Amino acid sequence: VTDTISDSASDPAADPSEREFGQAGIALSTYRFPTGWFIVSFSSDLAAGQVKRAHYFGEELVLFRTESGQVHVMEAYCQHLGANLGVGGTVEGENIVCPWHGWRWRGDGTNALIPYSKIGCKNNVRIRTYPSMEWYGFILAWHERHGRAPYWQPPVLPELETNEYYPLHPHTQMLNRVKVHPQMIIENAADPYHVQYVHKAANPATTSSFEVSGYHLHATVNAHFGGGRASTWLTPNGPVDAKIIYDNYSLGLGLVRFPSELVATVQVTGQTPVDEDYTDYFYTQASVREPGDTGDVPTGRAAKFLALQQEVIKQDFFTWENMKYLEKPNLAPEEAHDYAALRRWAHRFYPGERPSPSDFGYTADGAPDPAAAKA
């Protein structure tokens, strides 16, 4: 079901913010860690047999890759005496080993061995684990407040299924820790009007479509490139009216696609909450190859577009790091509808203190709802 917000009002002159947000506005959830798949590492940063310490969702985590190559994500603390497995922990075969007393733990969090005990292991002891997977060179972890299983899977990216595009990794990787709630990053999809001011575009951008459905947000923005100039490196044949497509999957994964009239490109971003204040912003992009180029390093216009976009992304940081969330913002008629739709959609990813039969994505017994699996 696609969520829509009526544009009708008994008083056509009513303030758009009042009409779309209501008298109370739309609050930001007091629980800061939304449901969804989140990037917790680049795959290349975790070799076979390696252990990596991490801190996400307000928790200390440990990532490890077994000798067979399987990735696991779990809470960091050994359930023997509380040692941090991410500090000095090692991998033996398919298990992670505590550096303090050598207790071994399987990837599913169960105790595999107490090396000095006649009981062998404690079958009733378990470390909390996070569902994890590798997706186009990223390690993803599923976060859900109550530990419920994933109800959707990350999308297939057609651009990365062939050799027509340069690889996402490693030459386009960028990671920044930003003082911002991940939802504020997603709100860029409802805000084409900042492009002219923050990113110094010569002409304003406008939204041509905006919809939210299930765990998926899809928006199309019309933007003008090369205005007032006969030719630029990005628009060698003159100004271009380009259609930029935004897709967000829950609040953790984002895609931005640029058309071939510029440089055909797919950007892949991850907004992963570290704690109450900070978010790790993962960024990569893949552009169509330059004619005849079979290498992995972007060249020509693809390389220039990568450098440009990496700088453009950083231009948003100063606003995010210094802003205040307004529950009832004062918006122009052109922007109120989409902002309100996005914020209402985002609320479904913040379950309450206890599981509820009304929680999006789950049945009354807490199982993933098949109806919610559709993008």
Where in the sequence are the language-model features?
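Rieske [2Fe-2S] iron-sulfur-binding domain
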Residues: 2-11, 16-18, 25-28, 39-162, ...
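Short charge-dense sequence patches
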Residues: 3, 7, 23-27, 131-141, ...
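C-terminal catalytic domain of Rieske-type non-heme iron oxygenases
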Residues: 70, 151-375
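Short, charged N-terminal helix-start/capping segments
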Residues: 1-5, 9-12, 17-30, 199, ...
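Charged, low-complexity, helix/coiled-coil-prone segments
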Residues: 17-22, 40-42, 120-136, 243-264, ...
